[in-house]
Amino acid sequence: IHYVEGYSLNLFTSAQVMLKPVRQQKVGLLIDAGLEPDLKKRHLQVADGCNASLGLDIGPCITTERALQINLNRGLTGSSWGNIEEPDILLRSAEKLKQSGATAIAVITRFPDDGESLETQLYRQGKGVDAIAGAEAVISHFLVKNLLIPCAHAPALSALPLNFDLDPRTSGEEIGYTFLQSVLVGLSRAPDLVRKVNLDLKDNSFTQRANLLSIDDVGAAVVPQGALGGESVLSCIERDIPLVIVNNPGILNVTSKKMRLDERTSEKGLKVLYAKNYLEASGLVMALREGISIKSLRRPINSVSELN
């Protein structure tokens, strides 16, 4: 399993970068000056705890010159979005971390508290949109685009009041002041991003690429029905990589029907498989990997037919 940020995934699926697995990354901490002193200390304690208990290589650490000021918005589709008031300050701090030896960066920014909003309440019950996810994506995409090293974001928020009606999928976000620990664990083993244009063409290509993963190594893409318009999915379709489409409806509505994937299946040979849930999807992926005919797994099984 490789921890790959969304923009990095876009670069990977479009064949612009390859992934180089590593044993350990040196994770720099980038802290928004907008954090209150107590909240900042909580996050530093999390970093110390991950260092002591998990053996992660964390540091150096830098605090931005002034607050980054994150704004949360909603897009026309209803999905969450956001923007950074001080992107230049964010980038300067990240560049200092990279120059100081960090090979991956965990960003901690102060997000607006909206624990009482209807959107947040619905999300906690497993029925709504994650109001902060879009802004988080903007931050990590921005840094990866400029630095080309693994980056991920952990929002800093005030602790939410106890809720007895939580959806299990959100429970992990309720146990403390921070999401940082999961980010640090993921980044600690995140693969390096290697641009194809930087590979030495004069060198033996097999030697260079023996430990690199490319889009050519991908055997299938598992995607929720309705979320087929993303850049990575489109890149997979362009390369005729088999799609396993899972019935997991959300707010987006870019479906296989709207994408006319069934037409492409008959015309171009793209393999599109449908699954009712992720358990079924995992079985389809296993069958593809082992070269098992999907038809042999469905009932009834048709008899072999002779050509006229």
Task: Mark where each language-model region is.
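Short, charged N-terminal beta->alpha structural module
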Residues: 42-54, 67-72, 173-193, 197
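Short, aromatic/basic amphipathic alpha-helical patches
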Residues: 42-50, 143, 235-236, 256-258
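Fold-independent oxyanion-binding glycine-rich loops
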Residues: 30-34, 62-64, 108-111, 146-147, ...
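Short connector loops at secondary-structure junctions
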Residues: 59-76, 154-166, 253-255, 260
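Metallocofactor- and cofactor-centric catalytic cores in central/energy metabolism, strongly enriched
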Residues: 1-122, 128-133, 294
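Structural alpha-beta junctions
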Residues: 48-62, 100, 141-152, 238-245
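C-terminal functional extensions of proteins
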Residues: 159-162, 182-220, 224-308
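Generic multipass alpha-helical transmembrane bundles of integral membrane proteins
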Residues: 76-84, 93-94, 98-101, 105-108, ...
